[in-house]
Amino acid sequence: LWEFLSDGAMSKQLHPAKAAHDGALAALLASEGFTGASHIFEGKKGILNAMSRDPRPNMLTDNLEHLAERSDVWKINFVSFKVHSSCRHTHAAVDGAIRIADSNSFEIADIADVKIEIYSQALDLLDGVEPVTPWAAKFSLPFCVATALRYKDCTPSRFTEETILDQTTLALAEKISFDTKEDLDSMYPAAWPSRVMVRLQNGASYETQVDYPAGDPETDVTTEQLSEKFRSLAYPYLEHNTDSVIELVMQRTYAPKARELTDVIGHK
């Protein structure tokens, strides 16, 4: 359900917060003795039968017999972190743009054009999306790549009512074209690759390919990257307390108690 992209509606950004809210609410209700259906998945009127004419409930527990002894099958070990504040399908191109901007010396005005090559499934979602709202801008491949080339990042502050009207970024986005390539299609979904080519007015050109976006298990993610992502999200609300929260969480071998966190967050 991606129809929100057609008009830049706000619904998608509510989804993860609502999921976290519902998980916390379920735990609180259970702690007070609230009950739910004991066979919600496999029951005759459960989720599987509601969603499929041929449900296979055994797949829920297949290969779990030796799970405790096999850390390699725990999916949490293969979670990707979203380093950039845009659609995940844009991240390889954003990483490529940042790599080129970091490795070479040129001004935004020096850029003649930028070509992005990407896998087809990405354009199924991103093609035609215009940065008409801050949320829609996160799904605009030209806007995201232009932002990355200009600022060498794609933080939340790059997607505001003001930045989506910034003529320098928009003019650069107009120079960016994109297309699909079969060799990149063949890599997806094991990899989410992109190829970025930047040509300057003087004829110089730079090209790079990113197979795995920053934050993927194959690339790892550094503590500093995670900390910087937290700062960019939390600073408008916690201001200078962000580093205190990072220190409390990162310098522990165990999770801090909720009271410890609220004490830090509550003192501005």
Segments (PLM) and residue ranges:
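Terminal-appendage/accessory-domain detector
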Residues: F4-H21, L28-K268
